[in-house]
Amino acid sequence: VLCNSHIKWGKLLQAAELFGCDYVATGHYAQIAEHRGHFYLKNAVDTHKDQTYFLWMLTEENLRKTIFPLGGLTKPQVRQIALEHGFEVLSKKAESQDICFIPNNDYRTFLAQQGINTQPGNYVDANGKVLGQHCGFCQYTIGQRKGLGIALGSPKHVTHIDPINNTVTLGDHDDLLTHVVSAQDIRIRDIEWLTESPAVTARIRYKSPAVPAVICLPEPSEQLTRPTLQLHFEQPVWGVTPGQSLVIYKDGLVVGGGIIK
């Protein structure tokens, strides 16, 4: 998300302007729609490849200078077009889900190479009872079940990570379900979307479905120094992770987002 807003559209647009280019085009699966005189991100035709979740931080000025040629196509259509134009190797290239600068998605080795080596600490339950020892908190993610290296008689998931106390909390699958998600550093594209109806859909991670929700803004007296909102989901969402993006949609358009806290 930050790479897109700071590098691909920050530095790339600067370079485009130096070369006298009017637009930049990328291979993201997303579309741009104009509504009420403003430009919005819009879901791609290929819902399985839609990448609007990663692009929500793009500004309207960014969108005015961007073209998404693949947004109206499905992935099979793109592969067929590549094949018809002589790009047989590219048309059959395997897809990658890895972070571009981390080979084989081995972020643990990458962190170690950057000098980030956390010490072993305790696995605990929701009441703070010590269950065993983990290998370092940065090696775990919320919702993780495999690779914990501990047997407790029933499957357990990582439900909380506390870097300050170097503890990793383990719990049951349902412990990760919630109807309420809070986010900070929010950006709302047009407040009229909320005044007309606070009913939206939202995603808490890439590949998760957009779930119907209602936005609840804090009272002015409650507003913190970092803009904050709450979403109340109609159905419980699983594995909400602090630091990930919460992306808000209305009628297929990205109307805002924030960082889950």
Regions found by a protein language model. Give the residues of each.
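Nucleotide-activated chemistry modules centered on ATP-dependent adenylation/adenylyltransferase
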Residues: 1-217, 228-254, 259-261
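Cationic, low-complexity basic patches in intrinsically disordered or flexible, solvent-exposed regions
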Residues: 220-224
